[in-house]
Amino acid sequence: MRILKIQTLRGPNYWSIRRHKLIVMRLDLETLAETPSNEIPGFYEGLVEALPSLEGHYCSPGCHGGFLMRVREGTMMGHIVEHVALELQELAGMHVGFGRTRETATPGIYQVVIEYLNEEAGRYAGRAAVRLCQSIVDRGRYPKAELEQDIQDLKDLWRDASLGPSTEAIVKEAEKRGIPWMQLSARFLIQLGYGVNHKRMQATMTDKTGILGVELACDKEATKRILAASGVPVPRGTVINFLDDLEEAIEYVGGYPIVIKPLDGNHGRGITIDIRSWEEAEAAYEAARQVSRSIIVERYYVGRDHRVLVVDGKVVAVAERVPAHVIGNGRSTVAELIEEINQDPNRGDGHDKVLTKIELDRTSYQLLERAGYTLNSVPPKGTICYLRATANLSTGGTAVDRTDEIHPENVWLAQRVVKIIGLDIAGLDIVTTDISRPLRELDGVIVEVNAAPGFRMHVAPSQGIPRNVAGAVMDMLFPNEQSGRIPILSVTGTNGKTTTTRLLAHIYKQTGKVVGYTTTDGTYIGDYLVESGDNTGPQSAHVILQDPTVEVAVLETARGGILRSGLGFESANVGVVLNVAADHLGIGDIDTIDQLANLKSVVAESVYPDGYAVLNADDRRVAAMAEKTKANIAYFTMNSESELVRKHIQKGGVAAVYENGYLSIVKGDWTHRIERAEQIPLTMGGRAPFMIANALAASLAAFVQNVSIEQIRAGLRTFRASVSQTPGRMNLFNLGNYHALVDYAHNPASYEAVGAFVRNWTSGQRIGVVGGPGDRRDEDFVTLGKLAAEIFDYIIVKEDDDTRGRPRGSASELITKGITQVKPDARYESILDETQAINKGLDMAPANGLVVILPESVSRAIKLIKLRGLVKEEIQQQNSSTTVIDNQNGVASSSVINTLL
């Protein structure tokens, strides 16, 4: 077997709307292409020996052991690889269960789809599954050592990429509230919400966390001085920089016992408490110097260690932290007790689980020695042996919830302290013998104020009630049940995507909002180009959704991006599907128009239930998407007699209809006439039906998002088929005694649309400079040739600079073949170089002629036209002298009439 390609999906996709995290592996079975598993000697036995846990896979039989039943009876290797890849992740602690295997149009080549939690782990699991299955085919077994290494590697990948318990708690709470989130490039840096409404967090610091507060909290001595000056009980202490000053510092704080810690440490690093001798003090000083140049020496206060969490000025959780320890059973040594406690499945390495495994350091041995034990000692039953001086969870400590026990005065004090330091989220370390009594009564002190406090001890205490502290953070960042969302409008289809996206963005600008939009020619925010290029995939969508100024996102969503990575967002408010026609077939294992429709249906299916899928009622494949989506439906149609739309409106639905020369919004008994088509510049005086359809779709998408009819009309009236607003989309130029038209038509449907306009526009000679992308099927080029023969009087066949793997001249020959099949006496020539072909077409243009250029490079075509000298871009203007009245009905366009279609 051979892996041909591995793709990572991260959003709603062709395989699943709900499951976003999928690996798609294109697998060539090679010699196993026609060999089911039951015909491979020893394969079943070898697979069960390697992965007996596959017994738990139900598969199509729908019962325990169902998958292995299929293997025994005979199934193809791609299917087996799918299940093995899922099981390997499961054995590494990643609970995944979704998979699909489909044979492509190429015999022996399969698409294997597996769910993942971590991208790298998912890709690794796919490759490891192929290795495992191939090994069993070749040798009858997969070595145990290799399997163990695979599982360990997967565990390492999973651990290294995990968000951490605090961030994970925040993410889960966001998901529960329907707040979208995304992980940014830096580890633990996440974005909650989109655009102007988004917030960012790193660990438990927010973008509202003040830098001065963080700096102050990190300088523990400065914090202590400020708090002491405010009457807050803090430990007596001082800061030293040299060992020679240590003895004087000990005397200053009142003698032993003392605490020594780094000035700017965290997570308990370099801290030693309950120091009772000079030797211990020297060792503690050196340990602290490993973390900081400046060392704090403090009086040691006897009591229990508490962490009080304050969010947005309120105490939301309190935990008593217990240092890492073991409890004797009268039989086991200290070392054995540590090993036993570390077997707890809730303990892991670092922060990857709710508790951390206990690891020993210098302090551990000192504590054991002080208690009269070694690692080989057997403590009496019930005896507590402390292994760490500090109670941090990161060093193996545990937590007991005390939220309901803290005294109101201590609550008030904690909240006051956090306000003094200036933090929105803070963790206070308080030492007192009883948190239910005021600190002042028990000589309790506030030891530290911590920025970015961990949430583990609160969300998963070893004893007591788990506290939803992430909920308090969400309440602070998104008060009053805010969702953090902005309107997202996604536009897809075979043709018209860019024009509709630009028009929709332009309409939205009439509302005064900042619109971010992506198209095949670039990414834009407001009136400015952010990045040029074909930006119709998820990465470009993220540029818009991460921008803090964007209030509305209008995203052109192309086939390629959905296939490669899925959508760049979880759900949209509006999903527009313009049409589905033959294009890109045979690419990415999308071989039929029905498959292409299923792919584009992802946009309609990924709309919020309270949003709208805006569908073309005149395209049966698009109209059928209404059955797949849970969203509301809004249809647009060029046919005012559409039976589908009539029934939809009778049921209370909304639609955009081209009727009596008007673009109208219809809902129930009411028709809102927006504008006469000939008054909309984009429609070229009403002579471009496909542009009317685009305008209907954009108007309807805006209407269902509560953009007013007046604002929609203003947008339609001021948007033109110009180089500045729609480059490469029906750009018409006046070159004196002839005209040139530039359009990025590159598939049969778009050729037909251009042809309809050309026939309506001129009766003069029509010259076509035609071609198509090299990765299309042979029959597609032949079809382009046939259509060109029907549209143009003279044809110049050219090829793209990038032939996309096709031999130079091949596409031209196929187009020529199509031309001659339709019109044997057609006038044509082949000039493969696009620049030369365009110049030839312009050179030979007769008076009153029209040169139609369908280029690979729109910018190059426009540049060549402008080099001709005095060139006027002819933009269809609104005819202000025309009274906007329907002569047939005598109704002003701005009025609302009672009409039932």
UniProtKB/Swiss-Prot annotation:
Positions bound to ATP: 493-499
Catalytic function, reaction form: [L-4-(L-arginin-2-N-yl)aspartate](n) + L-aspartate + ATP = [L-4-(L-arginin-2-N-yl)aspartate](n)-L-aspartate + ADP + phosphate + H(+); [L-4-(L-arginin-2-N-yl)aspartate](n)-L-aspartate + L-arginine + ATP = [L-4-(L-arginin-2-N-yl)aspartate](n+1) + ADP + phosphate + H(+)
Keyword terms: ATP-binding, Ligase, Nucleotide-binding
Gene3D superfamilies xrefs: ATP-grasp fold, B domain, Mur ligase, C-terminal domain, Mur-like, catalytic domain
This enzyme's EC code(s): 6.3.2.29, 6.3.2.30
A GO MF term: cyanophycin synthetase activity (L-aspartate-adding)
Segments forming domain ATP-grasp: 224-478
One GO BP annotation of this record: biosynthetic process
UniProt similarity note: In the C-terminal section; belongs to the MurCDEF family.
Subunit and partners: Homodimer.
PANTHER family per record: CYANOPHYCIN SYNTHETASE, MUR LIGASE FAMILY MEMBER
Function: Catalyzes the ATP-dependent polymerization of arginine and aspartate to multi-L-arginyl-poly-L-aspartic acid (cyanophycin; a water-insoluble reserve polymer).
Protein name: Cyanophycin synthetase
Species this protein is from: Nostoc sp. (strain PCC 7120 / SAG 25.82 / UTEX 2576)
